Amino acid sequence: MNKRVQYLIEGITKDITIYLMDDEGYELPEALSIFHNSETFAKLSDEDTGLYIESSAYVYEILKGELKYGKIQ
């Protein structure tokens, strides 16, 4: 994976982890686990989707939908 892409993914992951902690009250390990085990994270990590160029807030909205409905809508 390209270093720049990896950097963007790590930044989004950091932001979403913080969003989960602030919005849902999760502790750090739980927030990381929820995101890393999500379909959203799998899509974010797939360079072919281009999701890594979107904002953290946009990716978080996708994750919230996944958590609510059990899959990406």
Regions found by a protein language model. Name each.
Residues 1-73:
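C-terminal alpha-helical interaction appendages
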